[in-house]
Amino acid sequence: MPADYASTARALSVSTTSSRSPSPGEGARPLWSQGATDTRTNAGFAARRSTPIPKQGIMARINAFNERSLALWRKMTFWQKVGSVLAVLSLNILGFGFLYITGRVFQWLGPVAEKWEHSVPVFIVMWLGVFFVSFPPLVGWSTFGTVSGFIFGVWKGWLLYASATVLGSICSFIASRTVLSKFVHRLVERDKRFAALALTLKYDGLKLLCMIRLCPLPYSICNGAISTFPTVQPLMYGLATAIISPKLLVPAFIGSRIRILNEKGEEMSLGSKLINIFSIIVSIAAGIFTGWYIYRRTLARAQELEEREREDIRHSLEADHAAHRPQRAFSDDPIVNAAATTLARDEEERIGFNDFDDDNVDLVIDDDDLSSRRSKSPYKDEFTDNESDVFRDGDGTNTDTYTLHTHVRH
């Protein structure tokens, strides 16, 4: 009876969670990798579960942002706080200064806009201006679009703006890729996030490029950044820029409305002024909302394609490991293969495959002086007293070294 009681107590003390049946994925995983991999898997699962839902209210997002900002502010040292305040003040001063200078530019252009509207040299100068600000780190691309609409009207200004933007983006792309080629190779080999984003563009590259071009990103910096993706070709990038060129009607339209208000503001009725001002505000709001929406969709699509690419690489790694064969190349393109290999190393750590060589034994023979010593010491069947005794003198210094290198999976 006491024995039965003790066994019953031990059975009841066992946690019910420990008796669950392992999933198929856990049973197929190597025993040496379960401990570390389970920790990473659980951490990744918890991180995915803790991701905030995008349908949260605006006030909740604002409160969360305020809390993060306050927490970051409290962690700063005194000089870091001083530097942050100075940086914010500098940005505000630059922003207001840019608005003031832009206003002065339009005031200066007002009297000459009608004369320059049909001038070919002015058209060429404006076109070259838009073309050259395509190269990083130059700025002023949006201002050139508004000025083009101000001087030449909506359609002529858009034609100037769009054509110079497309050709400028292609040339900037080629120049940036030439200059940054070594930087590209280092990023592909070391940064798994960059490698993942580069590989996602091979699925629906044109569609994703169009979405990126619609995002509210700095124009010249975006040209240089996208040129670092090895899977993007210059003509494809130029085609994506041409496809989204209707977006460039917005700054040209705003510039034309500003000219109308500047020239005929005194003659307009209050209703006409309000309509023109309202159209400008709606155009700006539509551009901001569209850019924000496309930016969110672009991030979601890139993450979806990255998961697909990782899944394909994971299946390839598992198949190679199950067949006891070395890892094969993922692509004939060396840069694409380097990016895929970077992701493969990350997937190896997640799965638990630290080495794909299954107990291969390499025999290394250090025989640099082997042939010379053979010629000096021919083989003899008889041993005389004149020769050294190997058991007394030892092996000496010039001996053959046999080293066994065994690759062991941890």
Swiss-Prot record:
GO cellular component: Golgi membrane
Membrane topology listed for this record: Multi-pass membrane protein
Chain segments annotated as transmembrane: 82-102, 120-140, 150-170, 235-255, 274-294
Keyword annotations: Golgi apparatus, Membrane, Transmembrane, Transmembrane helix
Biological role: Golgi membrane protein involved in vesicular trafficking and spindle migration.
Protein family membership: Belongs to the TVP38/TMEM64 family.
Name under which the protein is recorded: Golgi apparatus membrane protein tvp38
Protein's gene: tvp38
